[in-house]
A protein has these predicted regions:
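Aromatic-anchored segments of alpha-helical transmembrane domains
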Residues: 44-51, 124-125, 209-222, 258-271, ...
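Loop-centered beta-sheet repeat module
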Residues: 192-200, 205-243
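Short glycine/serine- and small hydrophobic-enriched flexible loop segments
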Residues: 96-100, 197, 236, 240, ...
Length: 381
């Protein structure tokens, strides 16, 4: 089965259905199936999180967002609630697979250079060329509503701006592909993974106390996000310990965890109290719900096989959705259906997001059929 050698790579990037088969040698069949099945569900939640607006303006000005109170709470529940746990699960499983395989450091770095770093560098270039092409077409064909989509901005960047846009350090701190902060942090955490392992082995209690403090207090860590370190550490501890997070989540009843999640979500968005702590607790509750939900996904063989198939394209969807697809689909959608009332706002929220998901997966399938080598390179295979 293809790409079996990459089963220790981050779950968000290059792990394929073949990994489930390989991991059965060490993991239980149930655990490996849960990991394989949940990827595309998590990615769908990530896409919903990234098409979430409380205010929106067309090029040239003019507010077009007129969300209703009901619509606002729907978006808050999905994008700022249920989707909160997706990235934590990705970090946790990525670290778990990395530490569980116990590969040598040189092997890990070699694999990650191909599976994470190469796509991390290539995808911004793909996006720059895409938007330059859109700008060229808009200018030549005089397509006015695309003027605000395409650009040649990268041609004016200084060396410092190139570095800032690729890595997010310096400038405004935002990467050109803003959602690639996940990959950046994963690269850094992979590089320092032996150090984290050593620190944990030497002082377990102190290490756990430190990462909890960093996460819940929101300590500023310049090179990586606090949640990245926290959930990566959770995955490391999971791999090094006897307990199973899936088993832990399975023991929690739905009627126990759902009220906790909803209560924290309501407190956060209604009263805006203790935002860092509340967000962290809510994300962890959502994290456990998603882990628990994976048990449902593997019960039906057809459902499981379908999820594993689409999971092959989860990284492609991740890479292409937030700039390329969102820019085009949202621009065209708002041109046809301006968000002038609550109904059209909700229609945009669900319609654009669903189209982004379908288009991203569809483009991935098409590219894989037309040019498998290019698909593999862009996806770190």
């Amino acid at each position: 089965m293809e790409n079996q050698e990459n089963c220790s790579t981050p779950v968000m990037t290059t792990e394929t259905a073949g990994c489930a088969a390989v991991l059965k040698k060490k993991l239980s069949d149930e655990t490996s199936k849960k990991i394989a099945a949940i990827r595309i569900i998590l990615m769908i939640l990530v896409v919903f999180a990234h098409n979430n607006y409380n205010e929106l303006a067309l090029p040239g000005g003019g507010a077009v967002f007129n969300q209703s109170v009901f619509g606002k709470w729907v978006q808050l529940l999905i994008s700022d609630g249920l989707a909160r746990g997706a990235v934590p699960v990705f970090f946790t499983i990525s670290a778990f697979l990395l530490y569980y395989k116990k590969n040598s450091y040189s092997v890990v770095l070699k694999k990650k250079a191909k599976s994470i770093f190469l796509p991390f560098i290539l995808w911004p270039v793909v996006n720059m060329l895409f938007f330059a092409a859109v700008k060229f077409i808009a200018d030549v064909a005089h397509i006015g509503f695309l003027d605000g989509v395409g650009n040649y901005d990268f041609l004016t960047w200084t060396p410092k701006e190139w570095f800032s846009n690729f890595f997010g350090y310096g400038g405004d701190g935002i990467l050109y592909l803003s959602h690639f902060w996940f990959l950046r942090d994963l690269i850094i955490l992979t590089i320092i993974s032996p150090v984290l392992s050593l620190l944990y082995d030497k002082a377990k209690v102190l290490y756990v106390a430190a990462i909890i403090y960093i996460e819940f207090v929101g300590v500023y860590t310049y090179f990586i996000m606090p949640e990245s370190l926290f959930y990566f550490s959770v995955g490391m501890i999971w791999a090094k310990s006897d307990f199973d997070i899936f088993e832990l989540a399975g023991k929690i009843k739905w009627y126990e965890i759902i009220p906790v999640f909803l209560g924290l979500w309501f407190i956060l968005w209604k009263f805006q109290r203790f935002p860092v702590t509340t967000v962290t607790l809510m994300a962890f509750a959502d994290f456990l719900m998603l882990m628990k939900f994976s048990q449902i996904l593997i019960k039906n063989e057809k459902v499981y096989n379908t999820l594993v198939y689409f999971s092959t394209y989860s990284f492609f969807l991740y890479a292409v959705h937030i700039k390329i697809l969102r820019a085009i689909i949202r621009t065209v959608w708002i041109k046809v259906l301006p968000m002038t009332n609550g109904f059209f706002c909700l229609a945009e929220y669900f319609g654009v997001t669903i189209l982004m998901i379908a288009s991203g997966i569809g483009l991935g399938i098409l590219l894989k059929k037309i040019c498998p080598p290019l698909f593999n390179i862009l996806n770190g295979r």
